[in-house]
């Protein structure tokens, strides 16, 4: 019954078991089936609208367009090496997304692109308490295969998360990507203000 309801809502949906990822058209949340990896490329219009960037620590080995001046690939383990400058982070989506967002927050000069799943632990632990601002993209993005060929529509809406003033300025000054800008008051600052007002 649940499978039928999801199929009816999603249209071209392929579900294999109750815990399997949902496939919508060409897009599959957990990996790019063509290459068997969690490697989907950021649409070039996003890079153009919010760039330029100094570093992309999640860059694919083969890429049809540049996302930053410097690229770290899976061989470099971008999560474990130092970051410099304004960072573009479209991390592998999955259980490690929170680790990438934690590093973005610690670096403090980063723009990250993830699914807008505000109920997740990654969002609760590394976005609301630490982000400077957010930009909820209107509609759903179409990511690309590493060949450069455009994939289907993403299985969830996306959000850009700014950590730091420069990344925030890029979101705030955007004029080409439709969506909703939101200045964030990190929850740790709210608690600090409450504590100070109680003293």
Residue ranges and their predicted role:
Residues 2-199:
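Class I S-adenosyl-L-methionine-dependent methyltransferase catalytic core
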């Amino acid at each position: 019954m649940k499978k039928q309801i999801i199929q009816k809502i999603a249209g071209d949906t392929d579900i294999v078991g109750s815990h399997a990822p949902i496939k919508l058209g060409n897009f599959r949340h957990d990996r790019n089936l063509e290459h068997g990896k969690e490697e989907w490329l950021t649409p070039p219009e996003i890079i153009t609208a919010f760039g330029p960037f100094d570093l992309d620590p999640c860059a694919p080995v083969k890429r049809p367009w540049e996302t930053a001046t410097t690229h770290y690939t899976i061989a470099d383990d971008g999560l474990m090496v130092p970051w410099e400058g304004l960072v573009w982070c479209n991390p592998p989506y999955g259980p490690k997304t929170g680790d990438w967002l934690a590093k973005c927050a610690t670096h403090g000069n980063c723009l990250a692109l993830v699914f807008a799943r505000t109920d997740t632990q990654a969002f609760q632990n590394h976005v609301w308490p630490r982000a400077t601002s957010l930009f909820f993209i209107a509609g759903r993005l179409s990511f690309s295969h590493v060949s450069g060929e455009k994939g289907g529509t993403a299985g969830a809406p996306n959000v850009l998360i700014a950590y730091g003033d420069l990344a925030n300025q890029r979101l705030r000054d955007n004029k080409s990507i439709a969506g909703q800008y939101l200045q964030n008051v990190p929850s740790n600052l709210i608690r600090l203000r409450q504590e100070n007002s109680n003293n």
